[in-house]
Amino acid sequence: LVGSEMCIRDRCKDEPVIYVMGGGPSMGAAYIFSICNLMEMQWVHSPTVNSGEYLHGPFETLDKNLPMFVLVSEGRTRPVDERALRFLKNYGEKLYVLDAKELGINRLDSSVAEYFNHLVFSSVLNNVYLRELSYAKKHPYQNRRYMWQVKY
């Protein structure tokens, strides 16, 4: 993880679209990062894709220029995440992979580890990646166009 925030900051700061993929226990973290952090706070178009549905159509949008955050969970759905990631590695280039195992979640007992994916991923995405991207874009993540600014 050390240094990855700088890579993301430098490579993603000018991207108009960033996909976020997660599945199973990481789907919530992927969704929050996509709609709350990237869309709401950074004004970046960001579809959230479920890794279990990726090879049913969304994979047709992939090319070497599409940035994609990929969350690889620990637990029963990990093989589904790994399958999508294998495809992405073959045909994509702008991949930013957060693997729960590399973040140390496998130190927890396997009977409960998958329940902590969201907590681990959200901490990194919301507190590290969002902030670094915000600094690089010179776009404070507290800024809003409409939320709390106009009646809606």
What are these regions (language model features)?
Residues I8-Y152:
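A SIS-like phosphosugar-recognition module
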Residues L1-I8:
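Short, small-residue-biased leader/transition segments that mark boundaries at the very start
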